[in-house]
Regions:
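Juxtamembrane helix-start motifs in multi-pass secondary transporters
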Residues: 30-31, 89, 177, 239
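Hydrophobic residues within alpha-helical transmembrane segments
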Residues: 2, 6, 33-37, 61-68, ...
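Membrane-embedded alpha-helical core segments of multi-pass
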Residues: 10, 14, 41, 69-76, ...
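Membrane-interface interhelical linkers
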Residues: 1-10, 17-18, 23-28, 33-64, ...
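Juxtamembrane helix-loop boundary signature in multi-pass membrane transporters
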Residues: 1-5, 98-156, 265, 270-283
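Alpha-helical transmembrane segments of compact multi-pass small-molecule transporters, enriched
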Residues: 37-42, 92-106, 184-188, 223-226, ...
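Structural signature of hydrophobic alpha-helical transmembrane segments
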Residues: 1-11, 54-70, 111-125, 173-187, ...
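Hydrophobic alpha-helical transmembrane segments in multi-pass integral membrane proteins
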Residues: 42-52, 100-116, 156-172, 218-236, ...
Length: 283
């Protein structure tokens, strides 16, 4: 569970700063630069550890699926953050853990106990409450929020992609599994970038924007490393649920740096998250 919480710290920081950077240089440039840096850094880690990458060839199917779903998830997630509203996008995105848990139970044969399942459900509900303002949500339900379809797509993509990242980590070790997934994912971004080359060329990022996007990639990589380490030997379902608290980090940064004030339902959400994590720790 500790690794899942560390993953949440990295992903929550990347989420907050990714939203800020995405509105300056565009969501696609943000994700391409951030994940390009992550792939380079992951390669440096493999070179440093001297782990063999030959076993990757036996898992090309899982690697391809991880790349497709993860690349789709990142692109749609940053697009959802760019379009907003965050009050809708964030709680929907937090449900990715439920997708991954179902896959872990179905295909890995995991059988979390009643206490773990209860703790996971309470945690996810708490995250959804913490990451939104119910008053704004009710006020904005008269029409389809522009970011909602993108948020749903990203939740499914992250759930499936997270499952396959865990699968790769278990079979290849966290270093090679993490490296293979980052590089394969980058190939997916290259395809998207080529398809959108005209819009990318019309909005070239400045040096400051590139540096900020690299920072987003570094934070995201911290999350990926922690998640990979946790799922290599622990229950994938538990690590997934623990990592799903990442919106709390983004909310905390919004309070600290943007002066936002939490609303009552967010306090309730924090309490539920704490309760859910305690139940997971006792499971």
């Amino acid at each position: 569970m500790i690794e899942g919480l560390l993953a949440a710290l990295g992903w929550g920081s990347a989420d907050f700063f990714g939203a800020v950077v995405g509105r300056r240089i565009g969501s696609l440039w943000t994700v391409i630069i951030a994940q390009g840096f992550a792939a380079l850094a992951a390669t440096a880690i493999v070179v440093f550890t001297r782990d063999s990458v030959r076993p990757v060839a036996a898992l090309t199917g899982a690697l391809a699926l991880n790349a497709i779903f993860s690349a789709t998830a990142y692109v749609t997630h940053y697009r959802a953050l760019e379009l907003g509203p965050v009050a809708v996008v964030s709680p929907v995105g937090a449900t990715y853990a439920l997708v991954g848990v179902v896959l872990a139970i179905t295909f890995l044969g995991e059988r979390p106990g009643f206490l773990a399942l209860t703790g996971g459900l309470v945690t996810v509900v708490g995250v959804m409450l913490t990451s939104t303002d119910l008053r704004k949500l009710r006020a904005g339900t008269h029409g389809m929020p522009p970011g909602l379809p993108w948020a749903v797509a990203s939740a499914i993509g992250f759930g499936v992609g997270g499952f396959f990242l865990a699968y790769l980590s278990r079979h290849l070790g966290w270093v090679v599994g993490m490296w293979a997934s980052r590089c394969a994912q980058l190939a997916g971004f290259a395809v998207v970038g080529f398809a959108q080359r005209k819009s990318l060329g019309a909005r070239l990022p400045l040096r400051a924007g590139i540096g900020a996007a690299i920072g987003v990639g570094a934070a995201d990589l911290v999350g990926v490393i922690a998640f990979s380490i946790g799922t290599q030997s622990g229950l994938v379902s538990i690590v997934l649920v623990a990592s799903a608290v990442f919106p709390l980090i983004a909310v905390g940064l919004s309070v600290a740096y943007l002066g936002e004030r939490p609303v009552p339902n967010q306090y309730v959400g924090v309490g539920l998250v704490a309760t859910g994590l305690i139940l997971l720790g006792l499971a």
